[in-house]
Each structure stands twice: as C-alpha cells, then as structure tokens.
C-alpha cells in the first residue's frame, strides 16, 4: 500500500517519519442510492491515532451528506458520489484541525476532553495543549463519543511508586545481607579462637610468658629511673640536660605553630563570616565563566558530573552557575531552550540523592524572579511541566518547593504566581488518582 506524509505542509519531506496510507475510494450503487466507500479508512485513522468514526463523520459534516461507519465490518460510507481528491482535501483539513499540534505541527497528539466540555489536543512531542474550535460540527460528535483515554500519567506514577518500593526493598535486602555477613564473621572468629585454644598449647603458655616479661621490663624501667636519679656522674647529667632541652624545644615548636594558625584564622573569617561571602558577585561571575568555558569545549554530558564534583563551591552556587551559563540572555522561548538542554539539567539533578532537584528549582526561581527576566517568568510553568514530563523533577519536590517559597523570605516573588497553575494541576491530578484508586 502506498504511503504519504501526514500533513500537507510535510508533503515533500523525504525524511518525515509520520506517514499514512493514501486514500482509496470506490463508488457504489446507482441513482439516489449512490454512495462512496472509503476502503482504507480504518488504516488511515489508525495512522492518525483517531477513531475511524471521526473521519467518516467529518466527511459527512463537511459534505452535508449522511455518513455511516460500521464497527463490525469497518466499512465507511458517505452518501453521494465524491472523487478521491475531494475527500483527500477534506482529510487534510481534519488533520490540521484535530490531529496536528497547533504549536509544533507534530501529529503525535491525544484528544483530551476537559471538565468544562472543551476538546483539547495534547502534544506528546512539545507538551503544548491546543484548544480546538468548538464551533466545528464534529466537536459535538467527539463529546458524545469520546476516545479511549490512555492512562499515561497514571502508569508513570505507578511505575515511579513501584521503582521506589523496589529500591526500598533492595536497601532492606542489602542491610539483611550485611547483618548475616557480620554474624558469619563473628561466628567464624569465635570458632577460630576456640580451635586455636584447643590445638595450640604453646600459644596458651606464651601470653603468660609475655605478661611476665612485661612485668619484668616495667620493673627494670623503674630500676632504671632510680639509677638515673642516683647516678651523679658527669655523663648522666649531660644526658639528662639534652633530654630536657629536646622536650623544651618540642614545646616551643608546638607553641609557634599554634600562634601561626591563630594569626591565619582572622584572615579567613571576619565577624563570623567567611571572606567568600563578603564579595560574592565576582566569584559567582568567575564560576559562571568557568561553566561557560566548559560547555564551549563540547565535552560529553556524561563528563559533566565529574566536572561538577571537582568544584569546591556549595551545590546551590554550582547549580545557579550552570543554569546561568546554559540560559544566559534567554527570555522569550525559555521553555524551548530548557527542552533542548534538558540532558544537562538531568545530569545535574542526579548529582545527589537528596537536594539536587530542590537546587534546580531554586535556580529556576532565581533566574526568573530575582533577575527580573519577565519573558522567562511568563514561561516558568511550561518549564516545570517540561522537566516534570521528562522525570527530571518529581511531584513531591515541586510541591515542597512551592510551599516553602510561599512562607519563606521570597514569598513576594512573582515566580509563585506564575507557578501556581502548574502546582494546581499537579494537586488535581493527584486527587483524581487517589479518588479512582
């Protein structure tokens, strides 16, 4: 069967990966009973990820004719004689209105019916939600015959929960194995000690001999001390003087070292604060510059972790520097830039088990709020949605970050107002999943 690109705008793209079969029609009947049969309508609808009844109904609405789709046989009929080119043109209009994303033009979309009975298209490629014109006649048919929803978000949450449970079980199993190994070592050490006591009588005797020897040595040392005190010869006196001098010189060296450390300490601190915090802007600029130079080298993303771990600055400062280096000067189109460079953020967000995602969210808030980037501030919700869809940030961390921000020192920041729709969406999705469970 011949294939063609989905969408008239992609007709001449030889490398376009979204394809559908070319339409094949057949005219049946005569007179008033003449009908047009769209033979491969089921295959076309399958390629578009839409029910075949939608395309059949759309042809009938646009042509002002009765249409019928038989679910059992897969037959699509439209009353009247219509040529293939005319129906193919109507199909292109259907694709443009009900299949392609209004943002990126990608046909990989899903029909979503909102609580307010509005038909939207959710793009799996860019995440854009397109609002379909509800004045179209087909929208009423879609509301009455909604498509089967793919529970992608629920599956993701279930997989995440299962993954967390699996990790916890693995940690518990590791702890149990460690305990078993420790018990085995203790038992083996006990057995070795028993066997050594039973089979080596010489070893039982030798400790007593050593103890006696030590006692003799101590007595000899005591005797030596008495001899030194009673020995008044010139050689003994000189020896004692040398020992005293060596002890005094050692004390003097220790005192001088302590004085040097005390002198150095005030230089590193001032009023309880490290000098590093007294003049942060130049150091932050240097850190951002280092990040930019590293990114210009074109090093693989896998090497980013080792580079970050080699830095001595606090984790939050490192994340701020990386974010500024990646998106310096970006305003409009901030969400698209984040999607392009998501791999860098994913690598940075997995540096630590706890805290890296929070550092990333703080960097986003600083970049959009404190820096006064109004264009980026408008797209902050889209940025969080993109990172959430890519599993770079988790729902619990976002909610925790939002709650702390509303009650923290930066509660007046405009970031929280722009983030609120995304947070409400997360909370509503969570409540719906709990109700269904």
Curated annotation (Swiss-Prot):
Instruction: Tell whether Protein biosynthesis is among the UniProt keywords.
Output: yes
Q: Which GO terms describe its molecular function?
A: GTP binding; translation initiation factor activity
UniProt-listed InterPro entries: ARM-type_fold (IPR016024), IF2/IF5 (IPR045196), Transl_init_fac_IF2/IF5_dom (IPR002735), Transl_init_fac_IF2/IF5_N (IPR016189), Transl_init_fac_IF2/IF5_Zn-bd (IPR016190), W2_domain (IPR003307)
**Stretches the record annotates as Disordered:** 148-231, 262-284
Q: Where is the composition biased (Acidic residues)?
A: 213-226
Q: Matching SMART domains, A to Z?
A: eIF2B_5, eIF5C
Q: How is it modified after translation?
A: Phosphorylated at Ser-201, Thr-230, Ser-428, Ser-431, and Ser-433 by CK2.
Listed GO CC annotations: cytoplasm; nucleus
Residue ranges of domain W2 in the record:
278-436
Locate the Phosphothreonine modifications and list their residues: 230
Q: Which residues does the annotation say bind GTP?
A: 29-36
**PROSITE patterns this protein is in?**
W2
- Keywords in alphabetical order, please: GTP-binding, Initiation factor, Nucleotide-binding, Phosphoprotein, Protein biosynthesis
Tell me the residues on which Phosphoserine occurs: 201, 428, 431, 433
Q: Which intervals carry biased composition (Basic and acidic residues)?
A: 148-179, 191-212
The free-text function statement in the UniProt record for this protein reads: Catalyzes the hydrolysis of GTP bound to the 40S ribosomal initiation complex (40S.mRNA.Met-tRNA[F].eIF-2.GTP) with the subsequent joining of a 60S ribosomal subunit resulting in the release of eIF-2 and the guanine nucleotide. The subsequent joining of a 60S ribosomal subunit results in the formation of a functional 80S initiation complex (80S.mRNA.Met-tRNA[F]).
Family classification: Belongs to the eIF-2-beta/eIF-5 family.
Question: What's the name of the protein?
Answer: Probable eukaryotic translation initiation factor 5-2
Native organism: Arabidopsis thaliana
